[in-house]
């Protein structure tokens, strides 16, 4: 399988492009069937999309009683029917996962795909459903600390070197995790959060990309260019403060693109001018969110390339 990596990551076969295009689907509803998710992946690759991202819920909105699948099994099904597109989560609530298990899962998939994995990471939502339903804390300060420590431990484990770590939330005692991911120095980590909340975007600026939720994403409207410009400026400032201004970094903006190539280009072009590196195609919140047919129809139309 060809090996893909983000800018600055080591993995043969990656090609440069101004903007790349992903499809973003939930892990519930019709997508909870692995064969359906695999078909979505196969068609997305055939239609020229660059990545397929899946949500990572265990409960979600409790009153909706969704059928929900494990995202890692879904991604495995997708890996077996694709050879080019990147695969990842958007997003995995790292604070509710054991770093040892998550590190193994992501590494195994990165090796299975020949280096095509992306880990989208964040707190996740709704906190009450995703954490409180199983007796876990819903204190967001504690969860944020667990998230930060979890990401740090993942990075250490993926090095393949002996790891000993003592944090407030996580402890690791003399562990070596091998094999390591194909992508070096690690599988790229994109951090999510709701903009204009600045804390999650400060966190994102310390890693490899930001995949924020911006205003109007759930209604099918295009992103507000002023809002995106403010976000890009903020992220670049944080990168500079961290001494990372010259390092590769992805900015992923999502929404529902308008139909037709010309309209799609009119959407993607101004966003590219602002500095985004990925457009993430998302279905608006509603009755069609968990249905495969609408997203397959959109996939077949191809990405809104500039």
What do the predicted segments below correspond to?
Residues 2-306:
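Active-site-adjacent structural elements that line small-molecule/cofactor binding pockets in enzymes
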């Amino acid at each position: 399988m060809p090996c893909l990596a983000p800018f600055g990551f080591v993995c043969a076969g990656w090609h440069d492009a101004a903007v790349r295009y992903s499809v973003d689907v939930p892990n519930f509803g019709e997508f909870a069937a692995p064969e359906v998710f695999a078909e979505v992946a196969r068609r997305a690759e055939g239609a020229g999309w660059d990545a397929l991202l899946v949500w990572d819920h265990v409960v979600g909105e409790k009153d909706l009683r969704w059928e929900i699948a494990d995202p890692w099994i879904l991604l495995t099904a997708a890996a077996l029917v694709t050879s080019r597109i990147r695969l990842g989560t958007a997003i995995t609530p790292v604070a509710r996962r054991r770093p040892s298990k998550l590190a193994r899962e992501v590494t195994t998939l990165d090796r299975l795909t020949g280096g095509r994995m992306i880990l989208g990471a964040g707190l996740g939502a709704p906190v009450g459903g995703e954490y409180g339903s199983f007796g876990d804390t819903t204190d967001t300060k504690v969860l944020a600390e667990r998230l930060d420590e979890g990401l740090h431990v993942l990075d250490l484990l993926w090095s393949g070197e002996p790891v000993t770590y003592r944090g407030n939330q996580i402890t690791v005692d003399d562990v070596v995790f091998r094999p390591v991911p194909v992508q070096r120095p690690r599988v790229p980590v994109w951090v999510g959060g709701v903009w204009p909340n600045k804390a999650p975007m400060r966190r994102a600026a310390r890693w490899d990309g930001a995949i924020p939720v911006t205003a109007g994403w759930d209604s099918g409207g295009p992103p507000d260019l002023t809002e995106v410009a403010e976000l890009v400026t903020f992220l670049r400032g944080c990168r500079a403060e961290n001494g990372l201004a010259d390092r590769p970094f992805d900015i992923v903006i999502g929404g529902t693109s308008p139909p037709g190539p010309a309209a799609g280009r009119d959407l993607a072009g101004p966003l590219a001018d602002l500095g985004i590196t990925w457009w993430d195609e998302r279905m608006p919140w509603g009755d069609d969110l968990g249905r495969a047919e609408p997203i397959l129809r959109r996939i077949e139309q191809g990405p809104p390339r500039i």
